[in-house]
């Protein structure tokens, strides 16, 4: 097997583990092991990295019936030392695709291996044309990734397309000033692919006047599927500004919400004045 592809597969698999949420982090011994520079060796390297570092095997078994040991046996039958690099890559992509996890991807010069069935197998539940109709042409661009306006029925409409960029405190202050007389706010995060957790937290912190426990995190502590730390609270603190919103809020979601957009949704769900609508 081409050494460059072999190195790329192993390194990217390790990088994938580093890119998982903090609850999935564990610096174990897998990356220091030596595997033969063959299709079988690379197959076992990737399977083992996943086996010892991935956090959600019990959940995937319960909800999808995924048995990771059975997956190894089934896909190992397709691995032989005369496989081409491309064929090996495609098999490895199918193997990790069994998990149906949008954060689990493998890339190479041939393609970007992914499983997006969590979105593509379901209705979009979103119309950009309808969103544009409500925004109109005289909307305000608050910053990179979000725009807003006050609708005719005195409801604020905030479209957050991305959390890729930081949300300036000054710009958020201006936005909430502009919508101060509104009876409520609709926050539309449909098809928001995520971005920075700090950006989503900055926005969410404007909707509470007290510290709120929004979720719990445990950390991967070893190679076993159930090697986790105790639970730690994740708390949302109110923004250190007078401009906070305590009137009703509706957050619109769909399956296009991903990563930090999901974080924003479940954080907002913990607040008393917020209603989530969508899937």
Please give the residue ranges for each predicted region:
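Short, well-structured beta-strand/strand-turn elements
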Residues: 185, 258, 271-279
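Bacterial Sec-dependent N-terminal signal peptides
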Residues: 1-31
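Flexible, low-complexity junctional segments that flank or bridge functional domains
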Residues: 23-219, 224-235, 248
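Active-site neighborhood of thiol-dependent amide/isopeptide-bond enzymes
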Residues: 191, 251-260
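Short, conserved helix/loop micro-motifs enriched in His/Cys and acidic residues
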Residues: 240-252
């Amino acid at each position: 097997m081409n050494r460059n592809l072999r190195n790329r597969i192993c390194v990217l698999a390790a990088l994938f583990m580093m890119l998982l949420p903090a609850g999935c982090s564990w610096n174990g011994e897998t990356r220091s092991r030596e595997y033969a520079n063959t299709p079988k060796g690379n197959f076992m390297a990737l399977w083992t990295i996943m086996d010892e570092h991935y956090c959600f095997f019990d959940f995937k078994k319960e909800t999808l019936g995924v048995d990771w040991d059975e997956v190894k046996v089934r896909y190992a039958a397709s691995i032989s030392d005369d496989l081409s690099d491309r064929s090996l890559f495609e098999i490895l992509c199918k193997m990790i695709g069994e998990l149906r996890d949008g954060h689990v991807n493998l890339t190479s010069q041939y393609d970007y291996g992914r499983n997006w069935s969590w979105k593509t197998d379901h209705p979009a539940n979103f119309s950009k044309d309808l969103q544009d109709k409500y925004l109109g042409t005289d909307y305000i661009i608050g910053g990179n990734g979000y725009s807003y306006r006050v609708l005719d029925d005195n409801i604020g409409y905030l479209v957050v397309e991305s959390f890729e960029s930081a949300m300036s405190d000054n710009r958020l202050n201006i936005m909430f000033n502009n919508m101060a007389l509104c009876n409520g706010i609709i926050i539309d995060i449909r098809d928001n692919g995520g971005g920075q957790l700090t950006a989503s937290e900055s926005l969410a912190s404007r909707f509470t006047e007290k510290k709120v426990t929004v979720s719990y995190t445990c950390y991967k502590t070893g190679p076993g599927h159930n090697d986790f730390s105790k639970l730690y609270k994740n708390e949302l603190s109110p923004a250190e500004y007078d401009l906070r919103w305590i009137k009703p809020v509706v957050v619109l979601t769909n399956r296009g919400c991903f990563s930090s957009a999901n974080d924003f949704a479940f954080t907002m769900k913990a607040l008393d004045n917020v209603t989530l609508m969508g899937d």
